[in-house]
């Protein structure tokens, strides 16, 4: 059933054979919708690759759980503002075990790493998915939270490096990076540090921002992401953000893997 849901998610198809067909129909009426026949009329090979390779193979690969594949895919879609597939991927993520409060935090996190407008575009889609599935305020994160523990030594080292490199020229950015990102956003408890890192790494690769990949991939692995999971996340992203972005990421990731203790 989850594979079939994924098929629909990938193409935003109307013929989703699940109990939620009627629930999702209303929210997609105003959005562009494709059927398998639509795709075959334009690109029959694409339809075959979608069913046989992407959904029949990539989404079934071991090494990265379906929940994590949904997190990676959502992060890529939001980072690139690709709204046509968001309704079904939000639904698929929920089916795969991503909680509404986690989706909320993913969108909030990506406002900082992919831009406010992209996050707001995701909100516009997610609100209808949440409404169709009766997701209420009790299932969402509160604004004021008890933050996760801060790695004081690691944060002091990061802050000192950034201050030394950029503090004199970009005081505002340096201040917000410390006060808002690493002493606030990253400590919100409704998205685990590992998952928050996975979202960040996925968004960086999705937008070809490799300069920040080394520290964030290291942070992800410090937070519990394994090398196998990181490799599979990059494999997943090849199909959603394109081979060139992934081939730009692989040398960076390979270097991170090689330099970490074994």
PLM feature spans:
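Alpha-helix capping and inter-helical loop/turn segments
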Residues: 81, 207-211
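Preference for long, well-ordered alpha-helical segments
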Residues: 118-119, 209, 229-248
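Acidic, glycine/proline-rich low-complexity segments that act as flexible tails and inter-domain linkers
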Residues: 20-67, 80, 87-91, 95, ...
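A short structural micro-motif
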Residues: 78, 96, 109-116, 205, ...
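Positively charged n-region of N-terminal signal peptides that target proteins for export
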Residues: 1-4
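Winged helix-turn-helix DNA-binding recognition segment
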Residues: 98-102
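Short, structured motif recognition centered on aromatic/hydrophobic residues
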Residues: 69-77, 86, 106-107, 196-204, ...
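Bacterial N-terminal signal peptides
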Residues: 6-15
């Amino acid at each position: 059933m989850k594979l079939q849901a994924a098929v629909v998610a990938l193409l935003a198809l109307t013929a989703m054979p699940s109990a939620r067909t009627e629930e999702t129909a209303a929210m997609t009426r105003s959005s562009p919708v494709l059927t398998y026949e639509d795709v075959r009329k334009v690109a029959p090979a694409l339809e075959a690759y979608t069913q046989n390779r992407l959904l029949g193979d990539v989404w079934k690969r071991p090494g990265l759980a379906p929940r994590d594949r949904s997190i990676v895919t959502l992060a890529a879609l939001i980072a690139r503002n690709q709204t046509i597939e968001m309704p079904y991927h939000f639904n698929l993520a929920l089916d795969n075990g991503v909680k509404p409060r986690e989706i909320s935090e993913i969108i909030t996190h990506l406002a900082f790493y992919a831009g406010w407008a992209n996050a707001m575009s995701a909100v516009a889609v997610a609100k209808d998915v949440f409404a169709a599935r009766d997701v209420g305020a009790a299932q969402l994160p509160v604004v004021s939270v008890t933050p996760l523990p801060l790695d004081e030594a690691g944060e002091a080292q990061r802050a000192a490096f950034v201050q030394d490199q950029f503090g004199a020229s970009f005081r505002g950015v340096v201040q917000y990076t410390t006060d808002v990102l690493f002493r606030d956003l990253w400590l919100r408890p409704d998205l685990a540090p590992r998952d928050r890192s996975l979202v960040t790494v996925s968004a960086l690769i999705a937008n070809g921002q490799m300069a920040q990949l080394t520290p964030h991939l290291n942070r992800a692995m410090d937070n519990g992401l394994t090398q196998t999971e990181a490799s599979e996340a990059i494999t997943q992203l090849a199909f959603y953000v394109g081979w060139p972005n992934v081939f730009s990421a692989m040398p960076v990731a390979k270097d991170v893997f090689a330099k970490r203790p074994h």
